[in-house]
Amino acid sequence: MEKSCTIQDVFERFYPSYEKRNSPPAHHRKTAYHIMNCKTGAFGVNISVCEDCGCISIHNNSCRSRCCPMCQEFPKEKWIDAQKENVLDAPYYHVVFTVPEELNSIIYSNQKLLYDALYHAASSTLDELAKDSKYLGADIGYICILHTWGSAMNYHPHIHTIVLGGGLDKDSKWKDTGGKFFLPYGVIAKVFRGKYLCELKSLWNDSKLEFHGTAEKYQNHYCFKELLDECYKKDWVAYCKETFNGAQSVINYLGKYTHRIAISNHRIKSMTEATVTYAVKDYKNKGQWKEKTVPGEEFIRRFLMHVPPKRFVRIRHYGLLSCRNKSKKMTHCRNLLGCKKYISALKNRSATEMIKLLYNIDVCRCSSCGGKMVPHLPDKHTPSVLAHMRC
């Protein structure tokens, strides 16, 4: 049994046979190619030479795929730094929207359409209820992030939202929530349920949905109606997971959700010729960690289920935090609350400068003598990534 294996190791061993048996779609094949070849030299190399001692340093390029476990830290730090400019020193709430598992097959068959519908339903629910004077009576700001996995890499689409605890009323004055989340969870869940199922029904009526695998039966009008009726009868779940009092705590928390993938390397416990063992949370036992073993190709299937559609935007900003509003309205909110504006530490920095700032590593200095490292232009034999496989 092998220890300390990585997701890259798992893909190298099991993906070739998985591809032969299953004929995965192009964006799954591309993701697998990226993971298997990340930092191997397949995406090119950076070569530098010390001016003083002649020491040569070769760094293999990463794949930069948003599904690669080795490529998330740098984008995450850059994104968090950019968000600091729009974080107020006010309460924030982490609200989660989930859908019943009966919808999983039809959502998976129509990922782009029905993931978008999740964002539409969650955002319109928050906007509508926040503007109601019964709850807050203000325009709010929030960020929505789609996750499609549970701890065991099972299919579990849900939306995480980071909601600003306050907003601007009709007179453009700041209205505070009083330190508590301002919307009843039962009301959120009911409104979200109605909006999502209404959009699902509209897409079915307009013949815009596809039906694959276990979702094929929903092509039939009566089966689809039964599905809707069943989902309307169920109590949907929306809940506030965390509350943050102040800007710094929410900033530190954001990165846990923004650039997360279905599973990270540290959860892979072992791999054999036929199986993979990884750590999962057992929510039926107070969230205790336990080990789960699956066939290698099943691990690949589970991982690839969570590759988003091509060019799909997972992190979306709404209300006061939307692109068209945040420059003016967030400045106004900052002035009302007396908050100082954060000056980005990473904006317009080169990659080498960011590495030094984030990790205190100076890649421009020789590790042997401390001399200056200068780029060495690659010759025609240096490997480069194929154009059709670039991110």
Segments and roles (model prediction):
Residues 1-391:
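Beta->alpha loop/short-helix hinge microenvironment recognizer with preference
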